[in-house]
C-alpha cells in the first residue's frame, strides 16, 4: 500500500515542462569541415557546377564568329575560300577548328600570330575600312595572283591584300600612306614576298636588293627579301611573310618599297571592344543561348564555381579543379529516437533534433494540462537565416580575384615558353582551388558552430527569464515549479514571462517537493523495518507448524524435561 502511495505521490509532483531544441529532418546531405568529414546536415548547398549542355550557343543573344574551315589568318587576309567572312557582324566569341583547312593559301608565315590572337580576346567587332585602294598604285601591276589560291580554276590572291609587281619593265619606288581619322585603333596587315631565286625576283620586281619599310610614330620596320630555294608547299618554293600593327588614332602609317611589297587594301577598325576569345572546337553553332560558354559546351548556372573547363567566355562562375564544394546552410542533422519519447534521454538540443518542428531552425516544445506542441523561435531563426543567406555572396566576395586562364598559343619555336606558361597557369589554378576548398571548409565549421551557439543562446535566454521558478532537467528542458498554462508558455517564448507573478507559488512547491523527498526517506525506513519483522514472524510461524506436524505423526520425538 505504501509503494502505491509513493508512485501516486511522485506522479503528482511532476510539473509542466518547456524544452529548447532544434530542427531535424530526413536529409542525407553531407559536408566537410576543418575538423570533420561527411557531417550530415539538415540543409546544404552545392556551389560547384559540374555540367554543361555540350553545345556552342549564342552568348547573351549575340552569335559567335564561326570560322568554319578557315583560320584567323585566312579570315583577316581574305583567303578566297573564306569569302563568306569578308564582312562579318559583331561576334561574342570566335569559333576556330584545331587544324583549319584554309589559312595561308600562299605558303609563308604570320609574325606575332599568337599575339594577334590574344588581341582578339578583347575585340568583338572589326569594321573593314579601305585604306590603300588598289587603283592608287598606277605605276605598278596590282593583279598579281597564284594558283595556290586558285578559285574556279583561275589564279587568285588574298582578297584584303594587293600584291604589287612590276609594270612593264619598271618597278618605281612604291609609296603609300594612311592617316587614321576613324576615331579608333586600326589593325593593319602587310606582307613581304621572298622569291625562290634571283630570276624570279627580276621577273616580278625588276630590281634586286630591294627593301620594304613600314613606319608609324611608334614603329619602324625595314625588311630585306630573302632569296633562297625552299621546299615546296602548295606547289611553291617561295614564301610570303606577313606582319601587323595597331595604328593609333590620328597616327599615320607610311609604306615604302623598291619591290616585294604586299600592301594592305583594307584595314580593320576596332569598332567594339569587350570580353571575347577563341574557342578551339570542332563543333558548330546550335540554336541555343547562354551567358557562359566553354569549348565543351555552355554552362547555365547561378553557382559561384565550376570545374567544366578553364577557358570560359561570358558571365561565368570561377573555375576550380575541385570535385566537391558543398556549403552547410543548416544544422547538424541528428533526429531524435521517437520510441524513447520527447522527454526521455534524447529530448532537447543535447541529444537530438525535432522533426516535428518544421517552421524554424530553433524553437520550443511545451507540455502542460492543456496539451503539448512545437513552436519555432522566429526571431533567432530569422537572424540565422539572414546570415546564412549571405554566405554564398560572402564566398564569392572573398574569391573575387579570380585568376583568368587565357588560352594563349605559342609558335613551334616557343615550346619552352608554352610549357612554362602552362606550368604557371596550372600552379595558379592549384592555389586557387586550394583557397576555394579551404574557404568552404572554414565556412562550414563556422556555420555549424553558429547554429550550436544560437541554440545555446536561446536556452540561456529562457533560463534567465525563469530563474529558480523552474528546475533544469539537464537535457534542454525546464520543469516548472508552478502551473504554466498556454498563455504562460507563450510569455516564455516571446520573452515577456512575469517572474514575480509565479515566484511565491514556485517557492512553496519547491519547498514542498523537498519535504516530500525527506518524508519519503522515512517511509522507506519504516517499510524496511516492517518487511524485516514481518519476514521473521512468518518464518517462525512456518517452522512451528512444521514441527507440530512432524511430532503428531511420529516423525519427530519431542521430550520436555523439567
From Swiss-Prot:
Function: Binds to sialic acid-containing receptors on the cell surface, bringing about the attachment of the virus particle to the cell. This attachment induces virion internalization either through clathrin-dependent endocytosis or through clathrin- and caveolin-independent pathway. Plays a major role in the determination of host range restriction and virulence. Class I viral fusion protein. Responsible for penetration of the virus into the cell cytoplasm by mediating the fusion of the membrane of the endocytosed virus particle with the endosomal membrane.
Any Pfam family matching the protein: Hemagglutinin
Cytoplasmic side: 547-562
Family recorded in the similarity comment: Belongs to the influenza viruses hemagglutinin family.
Gene that encodes it: HA
Keyword Disulfide bond: yes
Membrane topology of the entry: Single-pass type I membrane protein
GO MF assignments: host cell surface receptor binding
The protein's name in its UniProt record: Hemagglutinin
Recorded superkingdom: Viruses
Keywords, alphabetical: Clathrin- and caveolin-independent endocytosis of virus by host, Clathrin-mediated endocytosis of virus by host, Disulfide bond, Fusion of virus membrane with host endosomal membrane, Fusion of virus membrane with host membrane, Glycoprotein, Hemagglutinin, Host cell membrane, Host membrane, Host-virus interaction, Lipoprotein, Membrane, Palmitate, Signal, Transmembrane, Transmembrane helix, Viral attachment to host cell, Viral envelope protein, Viral penetration into host cytoplasm, Virion, Virus endocytosis by host, Virus entry into host cell
Amino acid at each position: 500500500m505504501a509503494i502505491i502511495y509513493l508512485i501516486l505521490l511522485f506522479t503528482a509532483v511532476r510539473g509542466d515542462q518547456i524544452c529548447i531544441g532544434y530542427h531535424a529532418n530526413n536529409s542525407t546531405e553531407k559536408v566537410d569541415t576543418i575538423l570533420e568529414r561527411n557531417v550530415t546536415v539538415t540543409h546544404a548547398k552545392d556551389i560547384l557546377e559540374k555540367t554543361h549542355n555540350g553545345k556552342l550557343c549564342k552568348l547573351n543573344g549575340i552569335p559567335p564568329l564561326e570560322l568554319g574551315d578557315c583560320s584567323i589568318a585566312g579570315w583577316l587576309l581574305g583567303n578566297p575560300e573564306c569569302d563568306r567572312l569578308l564582312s562579318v557582324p559583331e561576334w561574342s566569341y570566335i569559333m576556330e577548328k584545331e587544324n583549319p583547312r584554309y589559312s595561308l593559301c600562299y605558303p609563308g608565315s604570320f609574325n606575332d600570330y599568337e599575339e594577334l590572337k590574344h588581341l582578339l580576346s578583347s575585340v568583338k567587332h572589326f569594321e573593314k575600312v579601305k585604306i590603300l585602294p588598289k587603283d592608287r598604285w598606277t605605276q605598278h601591276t596590282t593583279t598579281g595572283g597564284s594558283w595556290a589560291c586558285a578559285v574556279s580554276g583561275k589564279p587568285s590572291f588574298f582578297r584584303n591584300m594587293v600584291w604589287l609587281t612590276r609594270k612593264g619593265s619598271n618597278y618605281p619606288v612604291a609609296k603609300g600612306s594612311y592617316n587614321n581619322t576613324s576615331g579608333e585603333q586600326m589593325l593593319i596587315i602587310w606582307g613581304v614576298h621572298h622569291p625562290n631565286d634571283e630570276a624570279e625576283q627580276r621577273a616580278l620586281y625588276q630590281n634586286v636588293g630591294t627593301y620594304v619599310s613600314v613606319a608609324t610614330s611608334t614603329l619602324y620596320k625595314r625588311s630585306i627579301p630573302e632569296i633562297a630555294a625552299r621546299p615546296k608547299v602548295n606547289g611553291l618554293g617561295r614564301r610570303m611573310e606577313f606582319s601587323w600593327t595597331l595604328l593609333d588614332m590620328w597616327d599615320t602609317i607610311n609604306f615604302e618599297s623598291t619591290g616585294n611589297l604586299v600592301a594592305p587594301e583594307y584595314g580593320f577598325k576596332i569598332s567594339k571592344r569587350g570580353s571575347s576569345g577563341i574557342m578551339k572546337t570542332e563543333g558548330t553553332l546550335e540554336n541555343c543561348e547562354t551567358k557562359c560558354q566553354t569549348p565543351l559546351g555552355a554552362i547555365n548556372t547561378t553557382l559561384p564555381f565550376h570545374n567544366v573547363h578553364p577557358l570560359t567566355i561570358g558571365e561565368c562562375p570561377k573555375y576550380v579543379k575541385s570535385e566537391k564544394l558543398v556549403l552547410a546552410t543548416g544544422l547538424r542533422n541528428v533526429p531524435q529516437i521517437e520510441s524513447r519519447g520527447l522527454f526521455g534521454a534524447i529530448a532537447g538540443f543535447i541529444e537530438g533534433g525535432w522533426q516535428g518542428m518544421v517552421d524554424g531552425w530553433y524553437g520550443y516544445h511545451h507540455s502542460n494540462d492543456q496539451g503539448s506542441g512545437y513552436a519555432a523561435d522566429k526571431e533567432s531563426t530569422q537572424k540565422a537565416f539572414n546570415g546564412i543567406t549571405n554566405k554564398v555572396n560572402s564566398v564569392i566576395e572573398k574569391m573575387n580575384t579570380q585568376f583568368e586562364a587565357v588560352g594563349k598559343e605559342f609558335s613551334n619555336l616557343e615550346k619552352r615558353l608554352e610549357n612554362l606558361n602552362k606550368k604557371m597557369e596550372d600552379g595558379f589554378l592549384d592555389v586557387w582551388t586550394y583557397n576555394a576548398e579551404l574557404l568552404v571548409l572554414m565556412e562550414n565549421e563556422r556555420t555549424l558552430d553558429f547554429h550550436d551557439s544560437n541554440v545555446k543562446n536561446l536556452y540561456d535566454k529562457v533560463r534567465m527569464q525563469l530563474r529558480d521558478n523552474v528546475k533544469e532537467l539537464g537535457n534542454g528542458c525546464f520543469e516548472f515549479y508552478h502551473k504554466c498554462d498556454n498563455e504562460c508558455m507563450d510569455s516564455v517564448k516571446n520573452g515577456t514571462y512575469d517572474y514575480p507573478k509565479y515566484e511565491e507559488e514556485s517557492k512553496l512547491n519547491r519547498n514542498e517537493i523537498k519535504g516530500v523527498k525527506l518524508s519519503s526517506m522515512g517511509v522507506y525506513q519504516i517499510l524496511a523495518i516492517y518487511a524485516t519483522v514481518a519476514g521473521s514472524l512468518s518464518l517462525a510461524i512456518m517452522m512451528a507448524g512444521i514441527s507440530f506436524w512432524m511430532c503428531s505423526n511420529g516423525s519427530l520425538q519431542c521430550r520436555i524435561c523439567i
